[in-house]
Amino acid sequence: MLTGAWAASILWTTNPILAQSSSSKFPLLTTEDTTVKKVAPKNWFNLDPKKDQVNGVGSERAYQELLKGRSSQSVIVAIIDSGVDIEHEDLKNKLWVNKGEIPNNGIDDDKNGYVDDVNGWNFIGGKDGKNVAQDTHESTRLYAKFKAKFSGKAESDIAPADKADFEIYQKAKAMYETKVAEYSGQKDMIDNYAMMFNKSERLLAAYLDTEQVTLEEVQGIETEDKVVGRAKQIMELFLANGLTKETIKDNQEQLGNMLKYGFDLNFDPRSIVGDDYNNKNERGYGNNDVKGPDASHGTHVAGIVAAERGNNLGMDGVAEKVQIMSIRAVPDGDERDKDVANAIRYAVDNGAKIVNMSFGKGFSPDKAVVDEAIKYAESKGVLLIHAAGNDGADTDKTGNFPTRDLNDGRKANNWLEIGALSWKSGEDMVAVFSNYGKNHVDLFAPGVDIYATTPNQKYQNNSGTSMAAPVTSGVAAVLLSYFPHLTASQVREILVKSTYKLPAQKVKKPSEAEEPEVVEFGQLSVTGGIVNVYEAIKEAQKIKLPKKR
């Protein structure tokens, strides 16, 4: 499942109003709630905590003070995601191009097993060009798989050979029922928002004699009319926080799809792909449509890493010398282990040095095949960067797959797990939705109100650990661009060692509790720190070049 605005915590990750209203600790928005939230500083994720007093990663400072005049080379970053809009104005010059492939000739020119894979590959599409848009959640698939066998049975009824499957069934059923109830409540809430927005907008449009109501016009209203005054309060709250008719509609559609497809026990779109699904080692299936039916999430992720710097368009990505390889493996729903494994292998085999994975799920029934792909990437020196998830949960206690924890008991040394940080300071520093874990989350990175590319030459703010992961991938790409001799494990070690340390900072621990527990930031990750490219470069400069033989 995508771990940004399209994730399970969709209402947490789209804007401040919805973020505060997505769990039981927050009431539905009422007309009495007129607080206008502060706005994130422009380009804040590229700013520096010391120079700019905001917890960005220091990329602007690094380019200005440490990297001027230094030679660099391009680094390939694979984005395993929903797809990337490769025609976007801020990305079209930053794409990986497979020079061994002649475009659209129907031939696998470079003999890599994939026909016409010019900019990447799509593992959730068919040879006929059709694509999987929606899919079920893994809990739905597992519940459906075992329902007929175990429904209505107690543990005492289960044969010893079936105990493990029965345990999976119980966990999947519990998660399925919890999530259906949660998303149904969220859908009711966003429908309520839509009703309030539309009524207020119609009233104010008539009052102002205009077709489209703007924030400036709303703020300029002075009236004794209580009805108009109440509508003003509502619209000002919505518009000042970036919540428009379009974003409300998007949320309604996303939640509607989750309920319509993600939790339908009878829905299975896999026939579109046309692979032998039970053959987990199968390669070469899919098609070359790297954008797919909805590239919103993947395009946003790609822009954070690589949007062209200094072109006076939209925004600047973290990394300058980078090529984006788009690998489509994540639908609207949960990704499948077979596709994740093949996506990692494709990235490695085709030259990626960094793989960004802004997705995750609570079950991994074919974990072994993903583990083998992770170990393959490790053996080839490829760094894997993974979003920690948006459930406000302790991942030391709950599963978030894929994971660095391998079935053989070893931990992959080419893996970084990333939590999300807000632009706010003090106790509000950690994103309210971010997963955390003293042993499983390595570090935090900016992940709230990140302004980046979206399809069709657009840009928007999104939030999630989905955004924090590509910020970190961008930092890693800067290091490898200027210090190409570094290995994946060295880059990982540098990023961990050079974090901007705030271990004793008191922060609110992400939670659904009415009164969030205040803990030290150091309790939420391995490092108690924020990724920082400025400090990472200084650390990388200490590592000597390997001797030539």
Model-derived regions: residue spans:
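Bacterial Sec-dependent N-terminal signal peptides
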Residues: 1-24
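Primarily auto-inhibitory N-terminal propeptides
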Residues: 18-54, 60, 65
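Mature extracellular/periplasmic domains of secretome proteins
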Residues: 63-71, 292-295, 316-319, 335-356, ...
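Subtilisin-like serine protease catalytic core
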Residues: 63-77, 84-99, 103-276, 280-336, ...
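Active-site glycine-centered loops adjacent to acidic/histidine catalytic or metal-binding residues
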Residues: 81, 389, 464
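A cross-family glycoside hydrolase active-site/sugar-binding cleft signature
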Residues: 328, 356-360, 387-388, 419, ...
